[in-house]
């Protein structure tokens, strides 16, 4: 709902309607067969790419005069590599490295006033940024009762920590225009980050019975550190962005209908980390949201053609974004006054997912 001193001439009330198609591939295996020990040691990896695998480095960072949502968009390539093992009876630990890319590009060229270049030199490099992920899981019955009949039957708790990560790009260009801009030339430098994930600490508990289980997780995300990260972002450093840490409760349940079909469902309440109504030039939009998810898993123990069991999973998540007011501002000298537009935003997001799992 636009209003203000100089509202934009919008063709519709839709600010953002851009689909994202992410593909994940992963594997888990027991490495104990490679050693003389029978103690299980598990290794796994998961990789994510955008647009069904066609975009390895999907990336976008820009200012916006019409407003842009903070939380949604394409995700660039990432890779998680990790291992896990049982250290004590009923106590499992895991350690993973999350790998993202930090890219650098340097351009040096002579050019004329028409933009024709000569004597070009271009250098592009990308280096990995590695961040830790740690997990701990405790099966109370196995730990305290050795797996026999116990008052703690079906109770498990888990603790995890994921270090912050992002994708960063730096571009530095130097141009010389003979007769206009002599050596050492005009230097243009841009540094920006995208796909930021904060430090996340999660504590969860589940109660399991023969055919069902229910779990509750509290997830603490330290978004306040992002304010300092944006100080070195040449696209967003003027926005004076401030973020708050948030606590997200998640509740989920699973019910096994029969040997083939399992149903799942869950709900989460997520507060926005974005503080304030203004972010100069960038004009970020975000609000609290409620997440509701439903899913089903079909396990085929004797699928046609294949010699091993096959699992097919399907899920749907609906996100309800609450209403919130924002004031759009700009440093553009053509803008008559600030804020030039006040908008009231709300929306929804639908996420469809499917997965195929083979065990062999």
Sequence positions of predicted segments:
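Outer-membrane beta-barrel porins/channels
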Residues: 24-360
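Surface-exposed strand-loop-strand hairpins of Gram-negative outer-membrane beta-barrel proteins
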Residues: 1-18, 340
């Amino acid at each position: 709902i636009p209003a203000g001193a100089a509202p934009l001439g919008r063709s519709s009330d839709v600010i953002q309607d851009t689909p994202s198609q992410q593909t994940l591939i992963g594997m888990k295996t027991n490495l104990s067969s490679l050693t003389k020990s029978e103690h299980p040691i598990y290794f796994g990896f998961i990789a994510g790419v955008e647009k069904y695998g066609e975009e390895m480095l999907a990336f976008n960072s820009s200012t916006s005069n019409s407003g842009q949502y903070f939380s949604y968009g394409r995700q660039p390539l990432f890779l998680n590599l990790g291992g896990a093992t049982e250290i004590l009876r009923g106590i499992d630990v895991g350690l993973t490295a999350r790998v993202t890319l930090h890219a650098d590009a340097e351009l040096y060229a002579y050019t004329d006033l028409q933009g024709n270049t000569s004597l070009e030199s271009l250098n592009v490099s990308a280096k990995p940024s590695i961040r830790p992920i740690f997990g701990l899981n405790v099966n109370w019955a196995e730990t305290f009762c050795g797996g026999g009949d116990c008052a703690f039957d079906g109770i498990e708790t888990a603790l995890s920590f994921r270090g912050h990560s992002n994708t960063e790009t730096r571009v530095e260009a130097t141009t010389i225009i003979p007769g206009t801009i002599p050596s050492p030339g005009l230097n243009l430098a841009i540094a920006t980050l995208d796909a930021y994930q904060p430090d996340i600490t999660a504590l969860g508990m589940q109660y399991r019975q023969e055919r069902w289980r229910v779990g509750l997780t509290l997830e603490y995300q330290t978004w306040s550190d992002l304010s300092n990260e944006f100080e070195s972002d040449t696209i967003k450093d003027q926005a004076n962005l401030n973020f708050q840490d948030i606590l997200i409760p998640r509740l989920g349940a699973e019910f096994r209908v029969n040997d083939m079909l399992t149903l799942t469902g869950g709900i989460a309440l997520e507060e926005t980390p974005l503080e304030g109504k203004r972010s100069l030039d960038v004009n970020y939009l975000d609000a609290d949201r409620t997440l509701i998810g439903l899913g089903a898993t079909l396990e085929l123990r004797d699928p046609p053609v294949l010699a091993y069991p096959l699992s097919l999973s399907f899920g749907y998540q609906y996100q309800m974004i609450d209403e919130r007011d924002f004031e759009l501002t700009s440093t553009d000298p053509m803008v008559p006054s600030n804020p030039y537009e006040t908008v009231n935003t709300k929306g929804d997001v639908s996420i469809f997912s499917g997965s195929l799992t083979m065990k062999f």
